Each structure stands twice: as structure tokens, then as C-alpha cells.
Amino acid sequence: MKNAPLYEDILEGPLDGQARWLITADNVKIRAAYWNFSNSNGTIFVFPGRNEYIEKYGRTCKKIQSIGYSSIVIDWRGQGLSERLVKNKLIGHVNLFQDYQRDVNALVLFATKKRFPEPWFLFAHSMGGAIGLRAINNGLPIQKVIFSAPMW
């Protein structure tokens, strides 16, 4: 797992964040950012919506940290700085919606290896909510979840 960029100048979030490149089971490079601290009450996973990116959730992660939780956010394949599947890098294409589950699996594997504090919770917005619901149905070890609109 190599370091990935995290643009703190637009993040407006906690300053101690880190970003990593993760590789999914089908070899797609995705970006994840996290704020993990040892005396945390648990971890809140943040699943963004379509056309969103990690830095948009900086304020959210700052609030999460202020209430005593670690957080981890993902750029889905074809979104943010994650790898694009087509030549035109401005298009956020995915072959099958279920492919996003590979992104979830890579994120969970990373969080498990890094020993992110449990229990785990999920905040999922729009498309991230649809991805999150499927992941929960597939066994994502989440204790509680918040889904927000519009796609939800």
C-alpha cells in the first residue's frame, strides 16, 4: 500500500489524515483516506455518492473525530482520484454496479489489517448508500448505519 495524495488545502478536515492506494481483487487502484487514533470509540466508514471525492468529506471527518471516532473514506473506482476504467479520465464508468463491492472488500481488508477500532459504523450518501446496503447484505460487519439522499 503506497501513499496517495490527500489535499489538505481543500479538505477542511482533521490535519492528521493519511491516504493510501489500495488494489482491489480485480486489480483496480482506489484511494482511501483515514483518520485513526488509538483511544477511539470505534470507526465510521464514509461511503460517498457519485462524482464525490474524499476531500469533500473533510468537515464530516472533522466532526466524526470531535465526537471520538476514527473515520475512513473511499474514492470509488472511476471517482475522485481512483483509477478510471476507460481512456477518457473525465468519465466515471463502471462495468457492473456490483464491482463496487470489490472496492468495499479492499477497504475492509485495509481497515482490518490496520486494526481500525471497533465497533464499525457506516455513513453512506446517495450512490454510496446503494453500495453500502448491498455490502451489509453481503456481510459487511457494521453495527449501525446512516443512509442519506438523494439516490437513497
Which residues does each PLM region occupy?
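Alpha/beta-hydrolase active-site loop
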Residues: 92-112
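Residue in the alpha/beta-hydrolase core beta-strand immediately N-terminal to the catalytic nucleophile
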Residues: 120-121, 144-146
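Short glycine-enriched nucleophile-adjacent loop
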Residues: 129-140
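Active-site nucleophile loop of the alpha/beta-hydrolase fold
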Residues: 146-152
